[in-house]
Amino acid sequence: MQRSPLEKASVFSKLFFSWTRPILRKGYRQRLELSDIYQIPSADSADNLSEKLEREWDRELASKKNPKLINALRRCFFWRFMFYGILLYLGEVTKAVQPLLLGRIIASYDPDNKVERSIAIYLGIGLCLLFIVRTLLLHPAIFGLHHIGMQMRIAMFSLIYKKILKLSSRVLDKISIGQLVSLLSNNLNKFDEGLALAHFVWIAPLQVTLLMGLLWELLQASAFCGLGFLIVLALVQAGLGRMMMKYRDQRAGKINERLVITSEMIENIQSVKAYCWEEAMEKMIENLRQTELKLTRKAAYVRYFNSSAFFFSGFFVVFLSVLPYALIKGIILRKIFTTISFCIVLRMAVTRQFPWAVQTWYDSLGAINKIQDFLQKQEYKTLEYNLTTTEVVMENVTAFWEEGIGELFEKAKQNNDNRKISNGDNSLFFSNLALLGAPVLKDINFKIERGQLLAVAGSTGAGKTSLLMMIMGELEPSEGKIKHSGRISFCSQFSWIMPGTIKENIIFGVSYDEYRYRSVIKACQLEEDISKFAEKDNIVLGEGGITLSGGQRARISLARAVYKDADLYLLDSPFGYLDVLTEKEIFESCVCKLMANKTRILVTSKMEHLKKADKILILHEGSSYFYGTFSELQNLRPDFSSKLMGFDSFDQFSAERRNSILTETLRRFSLEGDAAVSRNETKKQSFKQTGEIGEKRKNSILNPINSIRKFSVVQKTPLPMNGIDEEDSEEPVERRLSLVPDSEQGEAILPRSNVFNTGPTFQGRRRQSVLNLMTHSVNQGQNIHRKTAASTRKMSLAPQANLTEMDIYSRRLSQESSLEISEEINEEYLKECFCDDVENIPAVTTWNTYLRYLAVNKSLSLVLIWCLVIFLAEVAISLAVLLLLDKSPRYSKGNGTASGNGSSAVIITSTSSYYLFYIYVGVADTLLALGFFRGLPLVHTLITVSKILHHRMLHSVLRAPMSTLNMLKAGGILNRFSKDIAILDDLLPLTIFDFVQLLLIVIGAVAVVSVLQPYIFLATVPVIAAFVILRGYFLHTSQQLKQLESEGRSPIFTHLVTSLKGLWTLRAFGRQPYFETLFHKALNLHTANWFLYLSTLRWFQMRIEMIFVVFFIAVTFISILTTGEGEGTVGIILTLAMNIMGTLQWAVNSSIDVDSLMRSVSRVFKFIDMPTEEGRSTKSIKPSKDCQLSKVMIFENLHVKKDDIWPSGGQMTVKDLTARYIDSGNAILENISFSISPGQRVGLLGRTGAGKSTLLSAFLRLLNTEGDIQIDGVSWDSITLQQWRKAFGVIPQKVFIFSGTFRKNLDPYEQWSDQEIWKVADEVGLRSVIEQFPGKLDFVLVDGGYVLSHGHKQLMCLARSVLSKAKILLLDEPSAHLDPITYQIIRRTLKQAFADCTVILCEHRIEAMLECQRFLVIEENKVRQYDSIQKLLSEKSLFRQAISPSDRMKLFPRRNSSKHKSRSPITALKEETEEEVQETRL
């Protein structure tokens, strides 16, 4: 960044904002980059501002029982705030004084007033000077107030972030991420621009008092008639505002529903295309859009009336003020013009400035109170440790997650001791405690010596992570004692990657030691990965390490924990995303050898780890089920250990399967498990299979696929239970992860639409607490096409050389946390870490965009012509009035009456030509109430245009090829449907209306002035030319600065969420100061852009006003010097010229707003112009209930005989198939050729990333493909894409359940009757599940069907395939996380319902693969082998490597017995448990 010219700028340059000229010039000539932005002044740095406010807040906390944040803010900013307020007031006073001078100038043209005529020129100079003074006072004052507002926001941003890092886990459990984002964006945005309006809460009343005093002098009591009308108008506007909010609240729920479905569609677009559901999804979304648009129109109409009321009020205010006085006493002409000028100022003060100021104070004080409450939340307490302690001891420890339970426990215990109450009372006390919440850990005891390994095992929700949290001090024990040295290192269950390089992630602020670093890299198997990157370990990782695989992230997290020199290492399931061989090697080399002399606590469920541990602690429902050695486990719990050992390949199971088996075993053998379960508990568990509610609702804030929902989900049907998920959670079900009331769930939890342009946004579905965010994994299943070849680790299954035994920790490092962070952090690096893709849109909206926008709906052009016709009619009326004035005698005393002092005065009477003249002045102010006949059709039509654009964009996205969609971020696509459509619906119609309204007022006023005094037209031409040139000059830079500012917001919120995700790691490593510094750097980056935007905006506003001041000076002196005796002419010219001043500036700002908002239209057009998938029929196939063919999803084909249906057998022939993700990309699959006989089952084999799932996608033509595939003799080139895809039934790896009823999810086209759906539900074992829910098939699933287990969701997919009657079934790891029961159901259904179908299976379970007749082995993008299992096992192959010799002995007899045509019977559950899973995930 460049040094700011502001630092060396002169007073003159600062006053006129001339120091911004270099950046304006550069922005006009070329595209601005981040390096072009100026550094912020030191006074605006987040460090200084936060330190200042933090000092005052600490002082407030120390001095008072009831601290107020507003007092701390007052001590920091009050005097500057008041100084600029006084400047603002003085600027506003000049507006009140201007009409006085105008009246004197008009009076000087009275033929009998010769005295004042001589000083008219001086009065004109005085009037012009008032405009100059107002310009010099107003702009510095407004800029100063914006600047203070910015500083207040920065200081509070920083204070809140520091508080977040200190919050206790119990508090984090009750705060949703949406609430934090809202706190930082919604509330604090009010300070930035709102502060300039705050002073009008006292300025406006003073202004009104002054104006009423001056009007009283002119009109006496009748002046209050106009004021009364304005007050009534303000109240009406307030009422309309409330009505508008009511409509908008109703509409928010509808928008929410639409965006939920849209986001689910975008997340699962591949499944939507595979199922051919494009039309069904489009119809569903369009139906929701229709309901939303009805409310949008109502809100827009109310807003329109509210806005236009201001424009139309001017005539009535003057009319009501003057008429009573004129009827009673008559009135001279100059009083009319003076009154008009006063009323213009009065109208602005009463109907705009004061209501806005009150709203600003209301919002700001509300925001300050919210922040104040947040800053007083309970903080994380650092436990006291004894550094000399070498052992880790836990004695009788009990803990609760619920806030206050522990304190309650202590208090009640003290009461027990004091009062020595009886046993009966004691039991009463404990029963009361149980009502408050169940303990997450109960009576835990263990002791481990230095250098020992403690393995902690237990089923899901047993309290394993909570145990580690308690050792770290994150969870306070309610009773018991914990003892350890306090020097802790921690590896989280869900790997957390901070933005930065691999090296920085591993070192994490600890001083660098080359030998130690290399040892850790080697032990964690990272050498091969790092060597593949061009930048090695200096490669910058994006948000959440998105470019890495799950295994790479896990190993970097482990390396970070191991690198730190600590006494105690807490490893929370660190091997979850590693394949079996890598896990074994890392466990041996790292945990057992490298860390041999360190105390380690490892959370695991692997038998191999339990055998090697010095001590084992098995938890069940928060209690210690067993503590001792492995041999003691076998002796004391023989049933339990033999049961686990009975699973021959327990270690080979995935973590989810091991947890499932462990849960069942613990349930069977625990003492508590034998007790009878109450009826209520049974009912509560009825949705769960083997204790699982299902796949945990992943709060993937940092994942661009799943982090795109901006609105909370509205639950239509009340759930019969609190859906707290268990599957991956480490806390028991009793723990409530979010205590936000249900009534709040309809709120949109995100800031206004202008807060984010790009970058991450936050989902609010069933508000997740921050603690829940920390204990959920980021979705690791990133599509492989999103990773570059360099960043995808090809896992080698070959054993690597064993590390020599070493203990690198003997090399004690120098003081920790010694990383120097005061140095300047590269902003480009920050941008690379945090920011989303920069949009490729021109700096200024092109004319082509405007023309396309006009052409969207023919009615829009007609409405604009209609507006022009009305405008011409208004001008014609105006000219007719002028003609009447010209022909009437100018000072007809016959129509007047003598005033008291004998001088000739112009009196208004009903017959006077001046009455017409007066009417015209009112007409000129409002141009005959412009809008009711013009504005309403315009607003209505613009909303219709928005409707059409949304429809076209949705259609285009659904029809776009996957190669195009893969290049876009899901969050970016949803932004078009949320933010940009909201702009098209809400902001654009009213902004265009305002601009048209203001522009016509200005043109009308200029036309009138020019007709009255032709010389003024000569002054108008250069002014309009200057305005157009200046606007174009400024617009280039301002739009780029706004874009950069918008991008600058992204790092702030991304860093916030990144910090929350890794908060436990941050605290364990003590890196809070480092992350505060990073946050301040991100804030400073945004501030630099925002401050420069504010400065250039003020430069532009001041230049516009200076041009108008010059114009007004020209008009004044032309009028004074060239007009003969005609006070009416001078009056109307000067009155309109003064009115033009404010109106034209408003029109200029509106034109800039229109240009800015039209960028959203440009982005929408960009999506509408996306290419469509090749081969799609122009006439889409509409399913019909009556049509039997569409009902069974089979189509007549020209290549097949009329009597046949296609496909009939399911024979597939693949010839030279090559697949790419994008046209110019590398081939993912090359020259694949093979054939499959009808009804044959083929298994796909290959390591992770070999291309198995890619091949299935290629069959569905979801990729760019070359070559040919034929099904039953019909080539894919000869039929439409939709017909081709409907030949396949699909069970994808990523299950797609959208928000809707069971019926809609199974049959979105509504083709099948209830009986047919129930029949299929019976076949796949879903009936019992669906019948448990109220409404059965009509029960509404939300949040991706989180109330269903992963197994139930797979059964839903299976049911869809059965209903489709497809002849070819594609299965992509259907049993990845299934419990044994659901897996048996799927196997049975595949054998029965798809007995005659061709099945292509990609699977990791060996037993499942044995059902296949042939296997296709894919290596290095090509087919290596295509044979039967016997041949594959007899040769050296990947399949042979994956199966141990003992397994081969078992498998051959079974395989030989199933060679015959009749397939083997379904394996029983007992047999199923003896299977082996070959886990090859990274």
UniProtKB/Swiss-Prot annotation:
Short motif PDZ-binding, span: 1480-1482
Q: Which residues carry this modification: Phosphoserine?
A: S549, S660, S670, S686, S700, S712, S738, S769, S791, S796, S814, S1446, S1458
Which residues are ATP 2-binding?
Y1221, G1246, R1247, T1248, G1249, A1250, G1251, K1252, S1253
Q: Where is this region: Disordered?
A: 1450-1482
- Listed Basic residues bias regions: 1451-1463
Return one GO MF term.
ATP binding
Q: An example of a Gene Ontology BP annotation on this entry?
A: membrane hyperpolarization
Q: How does it sit in the membrane?
A: Multi-pass membrane protein
What the entry lists under InterPro entries is as follows: AAA+_ATPase, ABC1_TM_dom, ABC1_TM_sf, ABC_transporter-like_ATP-bd, ABC_transporter-like_CS, ABC_transporter_C-like, CFTR/ABCC7, CFTR1_ATP-bd_dom1
Residues on the membrane's Cytoplasmic side span: 1-77, 147-195, 244-298, 359-859, 941-991, 1036-1096, 1153-1482
| Gene Ontology terms: cellular component | apical plasma membrane; chloride channel complex; cytosol; early endosome; early endosome membrane; endoplasmic reticulum membrane; membrane; nucleus
- Which annotated residues bind ATP 1? W401, G458, S459, T460, G461, A462, G463, K464, T465, Q493
State the residue spans of region: Interaction with GORASP2: 1388-1482
The ABC transporter domain is annotated at: 423-646, 1212-1445
Q: Which NCBIfam families match?
A: CFTR_protein
Q: What is this protein called?
A: Cystic fibrosis transmembrane conductance regulator
